[in-house]
């Protein structure tokens, strides 16, 4: 017979996200693989204060040629539907073009997670044309349509460079013929506003003030890891933010979480359930740490997903993923007076 306090003891041992799943009688496991998300390294030409990767110009962790070749071989053999290239600034890796061309030749839809300012850096005048010729989908970070808010999060001069880059992409057909999506992160420890409403505001402001067009806006909740976690602790707001995320847990998001159909690959080829788990070192294992070339898509189906309290960021409100909100059915209280959002 089970000890009367067994359930309470088990709940205490669970992370806060696992407790929410258990309370709602939900499980989280992988479905069929759709997206192979590849982190090409931690180097970036920026050092944004919200960055969950801790990326910066001084980082040296970058994917080597042998790793890129082994990943390219896997892509050609298993042909994932989507290949999503991220960093750091993925374009800084010398094997970026090789991986784009390999994935496109394998029939994959290719995504470049671009910080926009890389397009204005010396030595990257080839980049915009290369992306357009290969019909690469661009998901670009622009945390606000107001210059001051961008300056606070990303630094001086970043907004002007981002607008210049967007105009360059528009001239090549991005935002009309080719997909150009923007990403919004709240400035502080709040949840994003409803995605559709904010997208309308972005489109109006960028077109009116800068003549810039884009396809869609993705809202992403800040993950309580890396630099953002450091800021929360410095402000003594860690517990407050975790409580906000837990209070906003939305069961409707779980089925659509990106970790169910996305596989995250580190710059050394290591495997993770998502990019956030990658930054926390939660590597997939099968008695030993797994690398991409150790598995097939079929090996991963129905596998359980490693979780932590940070996963609450993906299930609060309308949910959050690398392609924005995961449901249009938020919990009502999140957009009322009790919990503020950052427009």
Give the role of each language-model region.
Residues 35, 55-64, 78-93, 104-123, ...:
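Core AdoMet radical
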Residues 246-280:
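C-terminal accessory regions of radical SAM enzymes
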């Amino acid at each position: 017979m089970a000890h009367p306090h067994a359930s309470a003891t088990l709940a205490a041992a669970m992370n806060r996200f696992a407790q929410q799943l258990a309370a709602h009688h939900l499980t989280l496991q992988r479905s069929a693989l759709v997206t192979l998300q590849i982190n090409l390294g931690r180097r970036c030409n920026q050092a944004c204060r919200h960055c969950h990767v801790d990326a910066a110009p001084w980082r040296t962790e970058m994917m080597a040629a042998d790793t890129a070749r082994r990943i390219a071989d896997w892509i050609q053999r298993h042909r994932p539907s989507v290949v999503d290239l991220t960093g750091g600034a993925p374009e800084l890796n010398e094997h970026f073009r090789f991986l784009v061309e390999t994935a496109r030749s394998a029939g994959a839809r290719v995504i470049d997670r671009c910080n926009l300012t890389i397009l204005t850096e010396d030595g990257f005048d080839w980049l915009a044309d290369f992306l357009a010729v290969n019909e690469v989908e661009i998901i670009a970070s622009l945390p606000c349509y107001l210059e001051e808010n961008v300056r606070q999060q990303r630094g001086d001069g970043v907004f002007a460079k981002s607008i210049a880059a967007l105009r360059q992409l528009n001239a090549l057909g991005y935002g009309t013929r080719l997909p150009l999506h923007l990403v919004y992160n709240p400035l502080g420890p709040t949840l994003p506003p409803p995605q559709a409403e904010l997208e309308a505001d972005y489109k109006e402001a960028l077109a009116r003030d800068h003549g810039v067009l884009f396809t869609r806006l993705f809202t992403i909740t800040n993950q309580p890891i890396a630099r953002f976690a450091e800021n929360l602790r410095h402000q003594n707001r860690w517990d407050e933010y975790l409580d906000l995320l837990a209070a906003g847990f939305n069961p409707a998001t779980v089925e659509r979480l990106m970790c169910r159909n996305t596989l995250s690959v580190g710059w050394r080829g290591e495997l993770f359930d998502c990019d956030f788990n990658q930054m926390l070192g939660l590597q997939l294992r099968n008695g030993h740490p797994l690398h991409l070339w150790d598995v097939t898509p079929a090996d991963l189906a129905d596998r359980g997903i490693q979780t932590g309290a940070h996963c609450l960021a993906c299930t609060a409100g309308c949910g959050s993923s690398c392609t924005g909100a995961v449901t249009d059915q938020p919990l009502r209280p999140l957009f009322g007076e009790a919990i503020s959002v950052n427009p």
